[in-house]
Regions:
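Consensus "Asn ladder" position of solenoid repeat domains
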Residues: 106, 131, 154, 159, ...
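N-terminal extracellular ligand-recognition/capping segment immediately after the signal peptide
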Residues: 18, 22, 26-72, 108
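Extracellular beta-strand/beta-solenoid scaffold signature
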Residues: 42-47, 69-93, 111-120, 134-142, ...
Length: 451
């Protein structure tokens, strides 16, 4: 173990320890250790894995703090891995010199607006455990190419950029678990311009990632989890977002979970499951645009200023067994599907708690220019103007639902509405406590509904 104090570091929070830490990296055994104390550094500590051998950065049970006063990452872990996660693609030198760089039990703080926490490139099997990064720009910054990353039991807190930033990186296999990722101005977990596969986000608290706690810094559209594949050659597939608390304060253009794709022939984001989460308090709680093959199930999704779930230009989205409502009187609720096809909504409950209908005037479940949508076994209560409101839709099937207005003074105009143009729509075997509104140019067949 290379104790940085043995290489000249003071750890008193006053003396600049940059050169002492660099000396420990160059001459030590690879296990960089910071005893309890506060260590000032003014420049990046580069750890070239190919020349240093297996490496680690550790503090003393969380009592060690490194303060970065310069620009750039406090620590850069740079490897040479250009293969995949397949054992046959990993060169012997990677196993011998570079595998599993580990960071644990240490805190980082920034005193420069352009300081980052950790930057990783070319690494194989990197591990973060028990790490705090605060008051930096980006907390953990993954660039270029990495494989098999594990991040657990970490605090990425109150940074001016992104907590965990996958930035134009080719990365397969990454697990993020049991961590707090909160109050980061540009997002909690953000993926842009990258090729990512096998991402698991499980058991985390991801909250309040917007500009509201950052004083005069500019506010930008953000999300707790942001996946953006609009750049050329970027793609994200095989993602699990399970068992997290994902909430915020509403911000302009904000979302709790946002997945975006451009309209072209490239592979859209898909093979994504969002399950068993508590998601709430943003402009749009879940916003999907251009996705293909996403499942949203078993979530509590609450309190929006626009929609709980907004789906645009998407295909094969399965929405099942979720609960949608507002949580505070100033917020709203509801789902909206636009220009989407081959989707199902089943086993969901949607409830408008407002006395007079939502300020937005939105129905609980809206469809616009959609095709082949199955709505089955849902309970929609107190929707105004309608429980289900479809415009310019075809092949929409509403079956086995209960749609009612339970208010003493009803505010709903009806249970279901079809307007614009459309063909082969059906409403069957539902319990409806309001009328069905059908425009003349929409084909809707009714069968065995209880009114």
């Amino acid at each position: 173990m290379s104790d940085v104090r043995q290489f000249g570091a003071k750890g008193d929070g006053i003396i600049d320890d940059t050169e002492a830490v660099r000396h420990a990296v160059k001459k030590g055994d690879g296990a960089l250790f910071f005893p309890s104390g506060t260590y000032l550094i003014s420049g990046t500590i580069n750890i070239p894995l190919s020349t240093r051998g297996p490496s680690a950065i550790s503090g003393e049970s969380g009592t060690s703090t490194v303060i970065m006063t310069g620009e750039g990452p406090a620590f850069r872990l740079a490897g040479a891995h250009q293969g995949t996660g397949d054992p046959g693609s990993v060169k012997p030198a990677i196993w011998n010199q570079e595998r599993m760089p580990t960071v644990q039990n240490i805190a980082l703080e920034g005193k420069n607006p352009n300081a980052d926490g950790f930057e990783l490139l070319g690494t194989m099997q990197s591990v973060f455990d028990g790490v705090m990064v605060r008051r930096m720009r980006h907390g953990i910054h993954l660039v270029k190419r990495n494989r098999n990353v594990v991040i657990s039991n970490c605090h990425l807190y109150h940074n001016t950029g992104v907590g965990l930033y996958l930035d134009r990186v080719n990365l397969h296999q990454i697990n993020v678990s049991n961590s707090h990722i909160s109050y980061n101005r540009l997002g909690g977990i953000r993926i842009e311009g990258s090729e990512v596969r096998n991402l698991q986000i499980t058991g985390n608290d991801i909250e309040y990632n917007n500009a509201k706690t950052h004083g005069k810094l500019d506010s930008e559209p953000t999300a707790e989890i942001w996946i953006d594949t609009t750049d050329p050659d970027s793609s994200v597939n095989e993602v699990t977002i399970n068992s997290n608390t994902i909430q915020a304060t509403s911000s302009a253009g904000g979302a709790n979970i946002r997945i975006l794709e451009k309209e072209d022939e490239s592979r859209p984001p898909g093979l994504i499951t969002i399950s068993g989460n508590v998601i709430g308090s943003q402009e749009n709680n879940v916003h999907l645009s251009g996705v293909y093959g996403v499942t949203i199930s078993g979530n509590i999704i609450y309190s929006c200023t626009n929609r709980n779930l907004l789906i645009e230009n998407s295909r094969l989205v399965t929405v099942g067994s979720n609960h949608f409502r507002r949580h505070t009187p100033s917020r709203g609720t509801g789902m909206r599907l636009v220009s989407s096809e081959d989707c199902t909504v089943s086993g969901c409950t949607l409830h408008d708690e407002s006395e007079n209908g939502q300020e937005s005037g939105a129905s609980l479940l809206e469809l616009e220019k959609c095709q082949r949508i199955a709505i089955t076994g849902c309970v929609l209560t107190d929707g105004a103007p309608y429980g289900i409101d479809a415009a310019d839709c075809s092949d929409v099937r509403v079956t086995g639902c209960i749609i009612t207005d339970k208010r003493k003074v009803q505010k709903s105009r009806g249970a279901v509405s079809f307007t614009g143009k459309g063909k082969r729509n059906g409403v069957a075997s539902n319990n409806l406590s309001g009328k069905i509104n059908i425009s003349p140019e929409v084909e809707v067949k009714l069968n065995e509904n209880i009114n």
